[in-house]
Amino acid sequence: MTANNNPRILLFCISVIIIFSALASYVQSSAGKVRVTEITIPTQDGQWLKADLYKPFTATSENPAPMVVVIPGFQRSKETLSNLSIELSRRGIVVISIDPYAQGGSSSSFSTRAATTEGYGMFAVVDYAYETNNLNYIDKTRIGATGHSAGGLAAIRGATYFGKEAKKNGTVSKLHSVFVSGFIYRGFTKKDLQPVSSNIGISYALYDEGAYRNKLKHGDLRLAPEALRIINSSINDKKNHINEITIGKYYGNSAEKNLRVVYNEKVLHPFQPYNREVMANQLMYFEQVFDLKNTLSNNNQIWYWKEICTSISFIVSLIMLIPLTQLMLNIPFFERIKKPIPNILPKPEGKGKILFWILFAISALVAAFTFIPMSELSKTLFVEASSRKQTWFFPQRMNNAIMLWAILNGVVSLIIFYTSYRLFGKKNGVLFDMLGLRIKRSELLRTFLLAIMIFAIYYILLFTIYFLFHVDYRIFFIGIRIFRPVMLLLLVLYAPLFFIFFLSNSLRINGTMRFSNDLQWKTLFFHGLATSIGLLLIICIQYVTFFKTGTVFWTDGWLYVNLLFGVVPMIFFLPFFHNYFFQMTGTVYLGPMITCLVFIMSLLSNTVCYIPI
């Protein structure tokens, strides 16, 4: 990539991002037939919800439409279920897709059990929609809720909550129907279901990793007591109660608010919302309970086109960092940090080669076997965040676990590097100047200022894209999204500690494995594998055990393992950037500074966060 080509490549990247973001927005609005608007809803105790309102133009005061509240699960924002919002709104249903409390742009909650006691905010949305005259284009007798995982728990809790309220007041339930995806082990006792006067649909992954918590310890719902209670709650005469469920069969009557159906698709828990069969089943359910006529076929789906477009934007936005940085390095103030690329390292031979692979294995094993222990340690060190209480002391429960793992592995990597260099490398032709560590204090400061500028430009473009098109950069649930200003404070809190890992990775890749300055794909792939193999080993252990025994290897820690679906791709591609930035500057510092700021802000803005109100 030559200096003369940098402006053209940068312009090309920005153009691609704009074009595919516009296309994603076009799909999201159903080719202009649905208006998508971000709204803020004030709720109890000074709390608030951020939400996206999908209003079909066919929904009017003369022709009011049913409404569905979409509730993402734990660690998810409203964008992660935009596919469902798109398909429901295409079929004439008004959708309010919320950021659950303590996630996305919504505030924290004073409740430590927000999904159960507040429906992650859904209770307040239903109350508002039912009571206000502002939403005169919705049919208040047909308000539904749906959610995945913990969002599914919120949905069934809503059916119980509004059922109790209706019986107490002698009225009908405000919640006409609920659809619960990916959650069944809580919220379905006889006590929970007794007051429900809403239709209920269930979709549960046959290969759900959390199925060990179910009564029968697996995901097959045909004989599951939890699912049987759901179906039998619609049958008044106990003599007619069933002992085995027919998957996909509708029981009960929608008009009497006792319709029940159970789906059991062959899919894993985290990928359940992004499956066409799962989507079709849920669309069929809402068409049935709302008695919709002349709607689109359930298999007529367009949501994946948006995912393709935002995926392209995601990838290109990260590629854009390279020409952007090269262009910025041509500014005289920053040009001073560029140094000649150090001589390549001598390839290890004999004992050196053996030592190289021993250290490679040690690093991988340490990475693999410290992740779950660090996750458990985070619960002890960060008690308030782990208890879902509002706090300024590292308020991100799940990222705290990743942070501890990153610190430990970063320190271990630095120790291994220093020890191998002192005991072996220094004596076998590895000079200090080959490592890319030598830098003046003034140059280090300029490097840091450049990283901040790259970070700012990157996110300014993202905010502009979101303002223009109301989409972000996203591959399913892996997203780079806009953030609240308070997240900049958290970046100052978290980034320095994560930086230990990022710097150690840059040093490892460029200071111990740079046997060539030619960035061939096989070299980059090896570097990516070297960085991520420990975490990949965790995923392999988890799912090989799961498919052989029916139970995941780490049960109580399965949600932490699920985090790795988003973390591993980031870790794998990290060396790609560290290699390129090293080639630009001749030092190991710029790469980890830029990637730490960009990637950690992505982590911070996509997780639960218990910041005080």
Residue ranges and their predicted role:
Residues 358-613:
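Alpha-helical transmembrane segments of integral membrane proteins
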Residues 3-42, 50-52:
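An N-terminal hydrophobic leader/cap segment in hydrolases
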Residues 1-7, 303, 345-351:
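Short, Lys/Arg-rich N-terminal segment immediately upstream of the first membrane anchor
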Residues 316-361:
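Juxtamembrane interface at the cytosolic side of transmembrane helices
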Residues 8-16, 313-317, 362, 408-409:
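Hydrophobic H-region at the start of alpha-helical membrane spans
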Residues 300-314:
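Juxtamembrane/start-of-transmembrane alpha-helix segments at the extracytoplasmic/lumenal side
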